């Protein structure tokens, strides 16, 4: 039994580390810089919206009003992505909702741009009450 414990620890410690999915304000700002200014929405506004929407967690999943919202941008399976929980989705973004849960954000940003073009920033409910003014706190200040 004594030989089993060290062997077990070696096996556990040799497993690959999982990449963190909760990002910082600066990492988010850098990762989504291509959406800055799109439809008139600044990077500071996005940093605020994403903090209040998903807590900068790329794997956030929230059930809300009969649909499920996925990822950093909290994109709903009711209209925008396809999920097994809501198979009748319009899937306007043409993407599996599961793809919105990885750390590859290009597809998330492309879908967010579609939502922004169709619905506007008010799609993200945090925008008006939390992110329409006093945005300097969302600026990334790298030392």
From Swiss-Prot:
Lactose synthase (LS) is heterodimer of a catalytic component, beta1,4-galactosyltransferase (beta4Gal-T1) and a regulatory component, alpha-lactalbumin (LA). SUPFAM superfamilies: Lysozyme-like. The gene is Lalba. One of its GO terms (cellular component) is extracellular region. Keywords: Calcium, Disulfide bond, Glycoprotein, Lactose biosynthesis, Metal-binding, Milk protein, Secreted, Signal. Mammary gland specific. Secreted in milk. This is Alpha-lactalbumin. One of its GO terms (molecular function) is calcium ion binding. Disulfide bonds join 26-140, 48-131, 81-97, 93-111. Ca(2+) binds at residues 99, 102, 107-108.
